[in-house]
Regions:
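Short alpha-helix boundary/capping elements
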Residues: 24-32, 44-45, 78, 127, ...
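C-terminal accessory module of base-excision DNA glycosylases/AP lyases that mediates lesion recognition
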Residues: 1-7, 67, 82-100, 106-192
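Structure-specific DNA junction-binding interface
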Residues: 1-61, 66-68
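Short alpha-helical scaffold segments that flank and stabilize functional sites
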Residues: 36-39, 76, 119, 171
Length: 192
């Protein structure tokens, strides 16, 4: 079964796990994120801050802060949508509003535009660019950006994403696949 199809049929617990993975990969490697999820999977539904931090120690660069992000986000989502992520994500008519909610909602900790895009793409939604340091460096190297620095505002993220979308059209590569191609060229691997 194709990856996107698996995600479209995943239950809410699996979607929550994927959101946690994206919280873990912010400021860390994809491998660190995967290992961190493995370490806390059994705690995602109800683990305390202390239990999560203990499980992450030696696995993640920021065990205490990431544990706090999980607790705050879980509590917010339990109140907002009873952790029914599929239903909540489907409630948005506009895909940009969906990402804005993840990136800007104060109750969701640890996600900016990059990781919100990462999560949405990983759960099978299309039209979002994952503008990590590898992608930004590639865009800088081919002259599409003046700097490889991450976009610091929503407006800059959207403008950079639009440049990637235009570049995808120019080179005739699917927009939703281009960042993965560029990422794998820089890292030498595809993890998920």
């Amino acid at each position: 079964m194709p990856r996107a199809s698996r995600w479209r049929t995943a239950d809410d617990a699996r979607l929550w796990e994927e959101l946690v993975y994206c919280i873990f990969t912010a400021g860390a490697s994809a491998r660190m994120g995967l290992g961190s999820v493995e370490a806390v999977r059994h705690l995602l539904a109800g683990g305390t801050h202390e239990e999560l931090a203990a499980a992450l120690t030696g696995r993640h660069r920021y065990p205490n802060s990431r544990s706090g992000y999980i607790i705050v986000t879980r509590e917010y989502l339990e109140g907002d949508c009873r952790l029914r992520l599929r239903e909540r994500l489907s409630s948005f008519g506009d895909p940009f509003e969906r990402r804005d909610w993840l990136a800007r909602e104060k109750g969701i900790k640890g996600l900016g535009y990059k990781e919100s895009s990462h999560f949405l793409r990983n759960v099978g939604l299309r039209g979002y660019a994952i503008l990590d340091k590898h992608i930004l460096r590639c865009l800088f190297e081919v002259g599409l950006l003046d700097s490889p620095q991450p976009p610091a505002t929503r407006a800059r993220y959207l403008a950079t994403e639009e440049r990637l979308r235009d570049f995808a059209r120019d080179v005739q590569i699917d927009f939703d696949e281009l960042d993965l191609v560029l990422w794998s060229m820089k890292t030498g691997e595809i993890l998920k």
